[in-house]
A protein has these predicted regions:
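Short, well-ordered loop/turn elements at secondary-structure boundaries
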Residues: 18-21, 84-87, 101-103, 132
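Glycine-rich phosphate-binding "P-loop"
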Residues: 1-8
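Short, flexible, glycine/charge-rich loop motifs used to bind or transfer phosphoryl groups or to couple energy/partner
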Residues: 13-15, 79-81, 97-98
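SF2 helicase motor core recognition
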Residues: 89-104, 119-127
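Conserved helicase ATPase core of P-loop NTP-dependent helicases/translocases
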Residues: 57-92
Length: 195
């Protein structure tokens, strides 16, 4: 993002995302996922749109992910055949960041911990089949991050990314992120047994 301090506008972000043929958007709050899904679906005329959250029962979530994978395969096949694919958009909470094998050409991630952003980036051109590199966009949502560790991780990422580094996933930055995160994290060792 141009600034790690300036929140986006949901409507403008939805317009931008809806302009892509295929995009995965990941946010940290269920309410954000529902709102952004509603806005994208209203703008993405003719597109297939899905919403994923941990509130879905496991079978429904699995069925939806299988449907998304099938749509992604059809999307890639249409592009390979020189045809116009049916646009598709997924808005999800962070449940897709680990253990869910999705491969999108464009991924949007709400500002979060560096580890979460890296996991989200792993859903972009995951299989390396795109003719050009995929694109990962980080945005600052207009809502507050959930309290606790998620806020601490987001704030630590903001501190490490000050000045918007050329390579946001450079190993020295990742090392610094985890050192700061674990140093600043509230301890569960109330009796100081580990000291």
């Amino acid at each position: 993002p141009p600034s790690l301090e300036t929140p986006c506008n949901w409507q403008e972000l939805a317009d931008e995302i809806a302009g892509h043929d295929a995009a995965l958007t990941i946010v940290s709050r269920r309410a954000d996922a529902a709102e952004l899904f509603r806005l994208i679906k209203a703008r993405a005329d003719g597109a297939r749109c899905w919403h994923l959250s941990a509130l879905m029962c496991a079978q429904h979530r699995s069925d939806t992910i299988a449907e998304i994978k099938s749509a992604l395969t059809a999307h890639r096949e249409a592009l390979a055949a020189g045809q116009q694919p049916v646009p598709l958009h997924v808005v999800s909470t962070q449940l897709v960041e680990a253990g869910v094998d999705l491969d999108f050409p464009v991924v949007y991630r709400a500002l979060a911990g560096l580890d979460s952003i890296a996991q989200a980036a792993g859903r972009c051109n995951r299989e390396g089949k795109l003719p050009v590199p995929g694109a990962v966009h980080v945005f600052v949502p207009p809502t507050k991050a959930p309290p606790g560790l998620l806020t601490l991780a987001r704030d630590t990422c903001k501190a490490v990314w000050r000045g918007l580094p050329a390579d946001p996933f450079a190993l020295p930055l990742i090392d610094l992120y985890f050192k700061r995160l674990y140093h600043d994290a509230p301890s569960t060792d109330k009796a100081r047994i580990c000291d």
